[in-house]
A protein has these predicted regions:
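Absolute protein N-terminus
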Residues: 1, 16-18
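Sec-dependent N-terminal signal peptides
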Residues: 3-13
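Peptidyl-prolyl cis-trans isomerase
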Residues: 18-26, 32, 53-218
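Short, conserved catalytic-motif segment at the N-terminal edge
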Residues: 41-57
């Protein structure tokens, strides 16, 4: 009898785990679980220094982020794009530790505990952010052209703002490299967003009913 009760108890635990980690979204050939959404919300709110929010809207936004991540991952694999080394995530983590926590590992650990995150999960998220930025540059930078006319037009339209921002030398010659870099960055981001929007529209996505119910902060 005791063995039977133990089996029943174990089965109940397994059932609870299945409910907790139910499939939330099917995107193409990929499955996004409830635990993936939970972790993404915790990481996003931690990095944004925001209060944890698990309402239906936050879960839906998280699901869309994770769908986009899968699209990008598929493109990285199919396109053979180079991935950054893990050491770059360690460098970004060190910068976060210095700028936000005054170099205190204990303060970082306590904040991670408050969001129920591990340092390994944080580092993985930082590595992913670097991966996305590197992919965007590799994939879209090559087709971007900023002409002399583009740079001059931007300068003429924003002269007053540029003079306030760079009072020592706001001449066109001095600011042209910054203007070109800014315009290039804007156009790279625009090309990336247009590509991602189109890819998202082409993706077969199924949201599972009941997976986005609001829950309290845990």
């Amino acid at each position: 009898m005791r063995g039977l009760l133990s089996l029943i108890g174990f089965s109940a635990l397994l059932s609870a785990a299945v409910v907790l980690d139910r499939i939330a979204v099917i995107a193409g050939n990929h499955v996004i679980k409830a635990s993936d959404i939970d972790r993404d919300i915790r990481l996003t709110d931690f990095l944004n220094r925001a209060q944890l929010n698990f309402n239906a809207s936050a879960k839906r936004e998280s699901a869309e982020r994770l769908i986009a991540q899968q699209i990008i991952r598929d493109e990285i694999v199919s396109g053979g794009y180079r991935r950054p080394p893990e050491s770059e995530a360690a460098q970004l983590e060190a910068q976060l530790l210095r700028d936000r926590f005054g170099g205190s590992q204990e303060r970082l650990r306590q904040d991670l505990e408050r969001y129920r995150l591990t340092q390994a999960e944080l580092r993985e998220q930082l590595l992913w952010q670097i991966t996305v930025l590197q992919f965007i540059n590799q994939r879209f930078q090559g087709g971007i052209v900023v002409t002399d006319e583009d740079a001059r037009s931007y300068y003429d339209q924003h002269t007053a703002d540029l003079k306030r921002e760079y009072p020592k030398d706001s001449s066109f010659d001095a600011l042209e490299p910054k203007i070109r870099s800014s315009l290039e960055g804007e156009r790279i981001n625009q090309s990336f967003n247009e590509w991602l929007d189109q890819a998202r529209k082409s993706e077969r996505v199924e949201f599972k009913q009941g997976a986005f119910a609001e829950k309290g902060v845990q």
